[in-house]
Amino acid sequence: MADAADSSMALVHSSLADSVLTSPRTLRQGQKWEVEYARYFGTPRRDPTAAPPSGLRYIMRGVHRHQGTWIPASCPASLCVCHPSLPSAVPVLTISIGDVVFEEHFVSILNFSWPQVTCVTQCPIRGSRVVFVSFCDKFKQIQKFAVRFPQPCDAESFLSCVECSCGSSGTMDIIPFGSDYVCEDSSASEYIVSNGLHHRLDDASNLEEQCFDHTIDEPPMNYHEETDQHVLEPLSASNTSNNSAFPPSFNQMLKSCSIDYDQEEPCPLAASNHVLQEVYVLDTSHDVANEERTAGKGMDAAEGVDASILTYDLMARIKTYMADESFNDMLLKLDKAIDELGGDMSL
């Protein structure tokens, strides 16, 4: 009798185990896809007089256009459309990451939207890799989530499976090509949609974009172009004050050469330039007295050059020397030598 009781208990346990294994949930069969998952969270209504919680701040209405934000998952998710074995059962769509189920809905209550995009005007319009899904919850609120497939053909196979599962009861919306959608590629961060899936970028890419957006506009510089430096700079006030021991006419000439030098135009030369070329040759020793004797001769009958031209050229050369730093250094050395000899200008 004990053996019979033990055998009956074994039969009871085995029947219970069979009933658990044959539950409707385990008999479901369906297709699976590896997708990227994102959920849309609407901004809750708030009291304008209430202060935000500590560490948070309110977002202005003009900043967020759709009063909500998309939050994508950081790792791939598993999308599955389950087909129960019972004829009266309804297919179920499930999205899970690992062992955690984030979405589980009847396919018949879901609304699917499939945007159509194109790369360029020459390419035909094709389906996107992103599918938007929406439904109405028990609080009469619209809930939305989105999935991104690796290839457009995967999205097409998923929608075909959904269409076969729900038959005529489901709602399928194919969004035509418009301004809200742009071409997508293999990069997960380049698909942009006004109310679509936005992917988070790391801080390094954000900093890199800010650096490229803010550029410094500078005029192009030629390879042989030099910096703006004046060859003949006006004499400083310190150099003029150092020459205070010289006659007043000489100091007046030093002051005027820095002001009038840029305003004066070169005097037109005569028909013959031989004498002027000879004057340029004699400027190596800064022999001003020799040039004064040459200019004081008046009209040179042999060459036919006017004495006024020579005088003007002599003054131009003197002004050039006055603007030369080496000549100013020579004047300072001469001034020191005269001071050492007793300061007698007659020497």
Curated annotation (Swiss-Prot):
Extent of the signal sequence: none
Gene: PHS1
Coiled-coil stretches: none
One Pfam family it belongs to: PH_PHS1
GO BP: homologous chromosome pairing at meiosis
Location(s) in or outside the cell: Cytoplasm
Effect of disrupting the coding gene: Male and female sterility. During meiosis, synapsis is uncoupled from recombination and pairing in the mutant gametes.
Name assigned to this protein: Protein POOR HOMOLOGOUS SYNAPSIS 1
Main function: Required for accurate chromosome segregation in meiosis. Required for pairing to occur between homologous chromosomes. Acts in early recombination steps and ensures pairing fidelity and proper repair of meiotic DNA double-strand-breaks. Regulates recombination and pairing of homologous chromosomes during meiotic prophase by controlling transport of RAD50 from cytoplasm to the nucleus. May affect pairing of the gene-rich fraction of the genome rather than preventing pairing between repetitive DNA elements.
Keywords noted in UniProt: Cytoplasm, Meiosis
GO cellular component labels: cytoplasm
